[in-house]
Structure formats: C-alpha cells, structure tokens
Amino acid sequence: MDGRDPNPSTAPAPRSATRRRFIAAAGAAGLVGLAGCGGDGGGGGDGGGGDGGGYGGDGDDGGSTDGGASVDSLSVGMVTSMSGPFAVFGNAAVTGAELAIEDLEAENDVSISLTTADSQLDPSTALDEARSLVTEDRVDFLMGAVSSAVALKIAGWASENAVTYFPTGAHSSALTGGGCGQYVFRPSASNSMLATTIGSEMAAAADEWYLMYSDYTWGQTAQAAVAGLLEEQGKTVVDTQAVPFPSDDYAQYINQAKASGAPAIGVLIAGLDLRKATNQIIAKGIQDRTLAMHQLEDIVYWGLDKESASILDIAGQVWGPAADGGDEFKQRVADRGEMDPYVRHLLGYVSVDQGVRAVLRAGSADADAMRDTLEGHEVDSPIVEMKGGGEMYWRAGDHQLIQPTYTVSSRPTAEMSDDPYREWFQAEETFAGDDVARPVEETGCSL
C-alpha cells in the first residue's frame, strides 16, 4: 500500500531482543531463526566445522526441559538478512515470527522471546551469529536464512552439533537433498517442488526455452529442475546462462536471450535482481515472449509499475496474497503498516509455529526429541488454513514440509488492487504437496 517502503535498509542491523513484552530472563534456552532464500553470490555451505557439543535444548537453563516436562518459557533466535538488498525479505519473516509468537502465547501457557541477528547476506557472518546465539544466548533451535548458501552453511554446523534448524525461506533443493541433515527441517517448498508446479504449464506454452539463472546454489538447482522437467516433456532448452549474483547490469544476458530466438524465457533470477532483469527485458523489447519464473515473490514486482509487473506469464509460488486462505493473517500483516503481506511473512510464521509446537509436544527442546516429534508429523495448526486447507506434513525421509503450491499469473493492470493490500497476481491452480515433491529416493538425502 502507499507509504510502505519496498526498499530495505543498507546499514548492518544490530542484534536485537524483541517481544511484545520482552522477558528479561535471558538465561532461558531459546529458539533461533534465519529467514529467506535469495543468494549471496557464494557457493554452497560447508558446515563451518563441528564442535561436537550438541548444543540444542540444554534443559538446565530455565527454559525447555528434557524428559517430557512442561515448557513454560522459550527464547526464539533469528539470524536473517536485516540490512542490504535482502532486508525486505528478512524483515518480513521477522514480522511473521512475531505474529506467530502472539498467537502461540495466547493459545498456550508459554512465554516466548525473539532474538534477531543480521546475517549481512554472508555465510560466514551468519554462522558466527548462529553459533553465538546457541552458545552464548543459549537458544534452543535455529531457523531462517534468505540465502540458500547461508542456509547450507548453518545447516552443516547445526547437523554436526545437534541443533535443530529451520531454513525458513531457503529453496535450494540441496537442503533436502545432498545437504540434508538430521536436525534440519525445511518449512519452504524446494526448487524442485516449485519447478514441478510450473513444469506442465511451461511445456504447454512453448516448445523451446532459454533459461537464465542466478549463479549460486539456489539458481543452479532451479535451473537443473526446470530444464529437467522441460526435457522430460519433450521440450528443448536451447541454451542456459549463469548470471553472477548480485549484478547491476543484465543487458548482456538479456541480449543473449534475445539472440537465442527462443520464444520463451525462464527468468530464474533471485531477489530484487529480478526487477533489474525485468526492466531490461522491457528495454530490449522482448517482453512479448513467454516469461516464466518458478518462485514468485510479490514484493519484487511491487517495486515496478503495474504495466511492467503485468508481463509475467507463468510463475510458481509457495504462498501469497492471491492464495486462498489466511485472510485474517494477511490483514494483520497489512495493519502493521510496514509492508503488504507476501510469502516471507508466512514463512516466518510457519518456522516459529512449527518449532515451538514441536518443543511443546516433546516437552523439550533437545534436538533428538524435536526430531522425533517432527518426523512424519501432520500439521494441524492455523497455518493449514492460511495455506488454503491442503494437507501439510513433515516428511521423515528428507525433512521437507510437504505442502500445497500454486501457479500464478499477473492480473490485467485494471484488475490489480492496492487496498487493503496489494494483489497484483492471481492464483491459477493449486497442487498438493505430494504431487510436486520428488520421491525421497531421488533427492540424494540420506538421514
């Protein structure tokens, strides 16, 4: 809506401890969260070196306890992009986490605090912050990451040190593939799920495709998934182009797409860079070609004018304003006055909701206890309604949250609404999570 700034701060954000009523008992064991999925230009994570300490769920710090005892206080920690080009994603997830805390405290006899730290979009910085939150702030589990490279870095360390971690908005298929971990549970859909969501529509739209993608783990796994699906359906990928991320100039890559002659272009570009690529697609006069993006984030297009946003033909989505369900949640986000509701708000909510509920079911924040209560768990919290009512469960074989996904397209400009919050896209079809998730045996995950 007007007055909501779609552009993030560029200054590093300090670590902060927030809550509607912050509990001063800082010794309580807690939860930690990172948010998101765009990239940092780095490669995949390497785990950061294990300490062998098994930090999660101490049980002696006045928070969660072992042995099935009740839990009356938790401290949630969140490492995410709070400055720089991805702050708009990280800060939305923080808002979602705060709303989840409000609901969980109202429903349960539990006090929850939230501690946030800025990843600065750097895997090493993020790992340092996550380690500090666990070892110094004594949080119970970690969640988050906008960047898939950041998420893989933290996931490796969490797996080696028995810390539960929810990579809140990271979509690289590696997180529930070769980079999966005993204590890592992905609440967002994977790239392969989103690629499958739009695969048939892409195949029906054109016989030949040119794919350009952000050159790091998120874009690499997206390109592999989309190309594989197109080729399985007998379509031709005339060429693929890895694009450095982030990049200020997409002109040369758009020129290559134009020169390819392909009637359709897959624009698998991360974060706000997609705005730059879209503007240059228009500048080069190829916006009439079929344009597809497997992972739509509404806020990226809200930074463009409506005419520019209307060029998107095919997109996949985890959730957004166009999705059925969650109307009350969407309005609560809008009432905050910070930004309109979109997928990162939901992912922040889901991560806290599922982490806290797992601790409460287990009576402990011990990583093994949380894993036991999450594996195979069928979700029955308010997030099911927010996602439109479809089945949601934590798959035991790879720790992927199986959930509905959507295909969406841009509305005609005359039908794009701005009140009570922006709705510029429309949902075309809903897919059951089991219909788009690859079989566990094909993921490369071994738990």
Language-model segments: residues:
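N-terminal secretory signal peptides
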Residues: 1-17
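N-terminal Sec signal peptide cleavage junction
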Residues: 36-37
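Segments of small-molecule ligand-sensing domains
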Residues: 336-345, 356-420
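Periplasmic-binding protein-like
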Residues: 133-146, 166-168, 210-213, 261-271, ...
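Extracellular/periplasmic Venus flytrap/periplasmic-binding protein
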Residues: 173-174, 181-284, 320-324
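Extracellular/periplasmic periplasmic-binding protein-like sensory domains
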Residues: 281-350, 360, 431, 442-446
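Extracytoplasmic "Venus flytrap"
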Residues: 68-96, 117-124, 146-147, 213-220, ...
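Beta-alpha junction/loop-to-helix N-cap segments that form part of ligand/metal-binding clefts
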Residues: 89-93, 106-178, 187, 275, ...
